[in-house]
Amino acid sequence: MGPRNQTAVSEFLLMKVTEDPELKLIPFSLFLSMYLVTILGNLLILLAVISDSHLHTPMYFLLFNLSFTDICLTTTTVPKILVNIQAQNQSITYTGCLTQICLVLVFAGLESCFLAVMAYDRYVAICHPLRYTVLMNVHFWGLLILLSMFMSTMDALVQSLMVLQLSFCKNVEIPLFFCEVVQVIKLACSDTLINNILIYFASSVFGAIPLSGIIFSYSQIVTSVLRMPSARGKYKAFSTCGCHLSVFSLFYGTAFGVYISSAVAESSRITAVASVMYTVVPQMMNPFIYSLRNKEMKKALRKLIGRLFPF
């Protein structure tokens, strides 16, 4: 596309959540409720892990990091959506859009890595219980956390810097409720080959590789559990993994839903809704999954609530 069709972009336009201003209270209330539930739920998980010494283990330390990441990922997208709904203004500045792209990549990448590390933790606990304290020592799982942070941050910075090199056309309407790197790249007039290569590479590193690791870990766990002689041992092992398996299924299920909707949906609004659900629903449901299905977490939460509201 020729230079005459390019322009210096100062802002992008996001998709309207609703076309009717009189109905804006409905989506605003929905997003606000989901956001508050996500923040409060994950904040309770953070406080429970900090306050209860029985939860100072690798598994709950990883859950602590996952809950913190959930708060950050949701906060990256939902507040801007709420502002746009209330103001009936769909614009987002160029700098704001790049910042949102970078933060979404950081926290989505972290979430994927943490889920893989948690699967490995369950694999070691069930398949190698006698060596658990040796294999999952504080230095090793601390290193895994730092490595996850480094990889996701570097990926986000590289992809954001490559977006900075792009020239954009006059059409700067993003068919989503927030800035997402793939959709922003589609608006560029300049060559996007390197950007697309980076996206495919990142999808492998933060999608296919963690997913393969999780599937391998659970295949080994299932094999090990089936060899257990007692039904009680099998139940305990499966219940230990149940929470993580539910969270993993929800996260990758919504991610797969985004991919399918973008590939087959005729309406861009369907893809937009699927994308925002990916950054909200798993993060909102994680605290409920862990608080309802994990006995130790339920006990810690009851103690915490008793301290916060002693009446």
Curated annotation (Swiss-Prot):
What InterPro entries does this protein's entry cite?
GPCR_Rhodpsn, GPCR_Rhodpsn_7TM, Olfact_rcpt
Q: Has the keyword Transmembrane been applied to this entry?
A: yes
What SUPFAM superfamilies is this protein classified in? Family A G protein-coupled receptor-like (SSF81321)
Keyword list, A-Z: Cell membrane, Disulfide bond, G-protein coupled receptor, Glycoprotein, Membrane, Olfaction, Receptor, Sensory transduction, Transducer, Transmembrane, Transmembrane helix
Disulfide partners: 97-179
Q: Which stretches of this protein does UniProt put in the Extracellular compartment? A: 1-29, 79-97, 155-196, 266-269
Q: List where the protein spans the membrane.
A: 30-50, 58-78, 98-118, 134-154, 197-217, 245-265, 270-290
Which Pfam families does the UniProt entry name for this protein?
7tm_4
Give the Gene Ontology MF terms in alphabetical order: G protein-coupled receptor activity; olfactory receptor activity
Gene3D superfamilies with a match to the protein in the record: Rhodopsin 7-helix transmembrane proteins
Q: Taking the first listed entry, what is the main subcellular location of this protein, grouped into a coarse class?
A: membrane
Q: List the CDD domains hit by this protein, alphabetically.
A: 7tmA_OR7-like
A single cellular component GO annotation: plasma membrane
User: Which regions face the Cytoplasmic side of the membrane?
Assistant: 51-57, 119-133, 218-244, 291-311
Name a biological process GO annotation.
signal transduction
User: Which function does this protein serve?
Assistant: Odorant receptor.
Q: What is this protein called?
A: Olfactory receptor 7G1
